[in-house]
Amino acid sequence: MNRTKIVLGAVVLASTLLAGCSSTAKVDQLTSDIQTLNAKVDQLSNDVNAVHTDVQAAKDDAARANQRLDNQVRSYKK
Protein backbone atom coordinates (compact mmCIF):
# COMPACT_ATOMS: atom_id res chain seq x y z
CA MET A 1 0.00 0.00 0.00
CA ASN A 2 2.90 2.36 0.76
CA ARG A 3 4.35 1.61 -2.65
CA THR A 4 1.06 2.58 -4.27
CA LYS A 5 1.00 5.87 -2.40
CA ILE A 6 4.58 6.56 -3.47
CA VAL A 7 3.63 5.88 -7.08
CA LEU A 8 0.61 8.14 -6.76
CA GLY A 9 2.82 10.83 -5.23
CA ALA A 10 5.20 10.51 -8.17
CA VAL A 11 2.28 10.90 -10.57
CA VAL A 12 1.18 14.04 -8.74
CA LEU A 13 4.72 15.41 -8.84
CA ALA A 14 5.07 14.61 -12.53
CA SER A 15 1.75 16.25 -13.31
CA THR A 16 2.83 19.33 -11.37
CA LEU A 17 6.12 19.53 -13.24
CA LEU A 18 4.36 19.12 -16.57
CA ALA A 19 1.80 21.78 -15.72
CA GLY A 20 3.95 24.45 -17.36
CA CYS A 21 4.10 22.43 -20.58
CA SER A 22 0.58 21.04 -20.57
CA SER A 23 -2.82 22.46 -21.09
CA THR A 24 -5.23 22.89 -18.20
CA ALA A 25 -7.44 20.14 -19.60
CA LYS A 26 -4.61 17.62 -19.37
CA VAL A 27 -3.78 18.66 -15.82
CA ASP A 28 -7.44 18.38 -14.86
CA GLN A 29 -7.58 14.92 -16.43
CA LEU A 30 -4.49 13.82 -14.50
CA THR A 31 -5.97 15.18 -11.29
CA SER A 32 -9.17 13.29 -11.95
CA ASP A 33 -7.20 10.11 -12.67
CA ILE A 34 -5.27 10.52 -9.42
CA GLN A 35 -8.47 10.97 -7.45
CA THR A 36 -9.89 7.84 -9.05
CA LEU A 37 -6.75 5.88 -8.22
CA ASN A 38 -6.82 7.13 -4.62
CA ALA A 39 -10.42 5.97 -4.30
CA LYS A 40 -9.48 2.55 -5.66
CA VAL A 41 -6.53 2.30 -3.26
CA ASP A 42 -8.82 3.16 -0.35
CA GLN A 43 -11.35 0.54 -1.47
CA LEU A 44 -8.65 -2.11 -1.79
CA SER A 45 -7.35 -1.20 1.65
CA ASN A 46 -10.84 -1.64 3.08
CA ASP A 47 -11.19 -4.98 1.28
CA VAL A 48 -7.86 -6.18 2.70
CA ASN A 49 -8.94 -5.18 6.20
CA ALA A 50 -12.22 -7.06 5.78
CA VAL A 51 -10.40 -10.17 4.56
CA HIS A 52 -7.98 -9.89 7.47
CA THR A 53 -10.91 -9.86 9.89
CA ASP A 54 -12.46 -12.89 8.17
CA VAL A 55 -9.16 -14.78 8.30
CA GLN A 56 -8.78 -14.06 12.00
CA ALA A 57 -12.33 -15.30 12.66
CA ALA A 58 -11.59 -18.49 10.70
CA LYS A 59 -8.41 -19.04 12.71
CA ASP A 60 -10.33 -18.59 15.95
CA ASP A 61 -13.02 -21.05 14.81
CA ALA A 62 -10.37 -23.59 13.81
CA ALA A 63 -8.65 -23.25 17.18
CA ARG A 64 -11.94 -23.86 19.01
CA ALA A 65 -12.71 -26.88 16.82
CA ASN A 66 -9.24 -28.31 17.46
CA GLN A 67 -9.70 -27.79 21.19
CA ARG A 68 -13.02 -29.67 21.09
CA LEU A 69 -11.39 -32.53 19.18
CA ASP A 70 -8.54 -32.66 21.69
CA ASN A 71 -11.06 -32.83 24.52
CA GLN A 72 -12.92 -35.69 22.81
CA VAL A 73 -9.70 -37.65 22.25
CA ARG A 74 -8.77 -37.25 25.91
CA SER A 75 -12.17 -38.53 27.01
CA TYR A 76 -11.78 -41.66 24.83
CA LYS A 77 -8.32 -42.39 26.24
CA LYS A 78 -9.61 -42.41 29.84
From Swiss-Prot:
It is a lipid-anchor; Peptidoglycan-anchor. A lipid is attached at C21 (S-diacylglycerol cysteine). Its main location: membrane. Residues 1-20 form the signal peptide. A lipid is attached at C21 (N-palmitoyl cysteine). GO terms for cellular component: cell outer membrane; extracellular region. The modification N6-murein peptidoglycan lysine is found at K78. Keywords: Cell outer membrane, Cell wall, Coiled coil, Lipoprotein, Membrane, Palmitate, Peptidoglycan-anchor, Repeat, Secreted, Signal. InterPro entries: Lipoprotein_leucine-zipper_dom, MOM_Lpp. It comes from the Bacteria. Residues 27-75 form a coiled coil. Sequence repeats lie at residues 24-34, 38-48. GO terms for molecular function: lipid binding; peptidoglycan binding. It is found in: Cell outer membrane; Secreted, Cell wall. GO terms for biological process: lipid modification; periplasmic space organization. Belongs to the Lpp family. Homotrimer. A highly abundant outer membrane lipoprotein that controls the distance between the inner and outer membranes. The only protein known to be covalently linked to the peptidoglycan network (PGN). Also non-covalently binds the PGN. The link between the cell outer membrane and PGN contributes to maintenance of the structural and functional integrity of the cell envelope, and maintains the correct distance between the PGN and the outer membrane. This is Major outer membrane lipoprotein Lpp. It comes from Photorhabdus laumondii subsp. laumondii (strain DSM 15139 / CIP 105565 / TT01) (Photorhabdus luminescens subsp. laumondii).
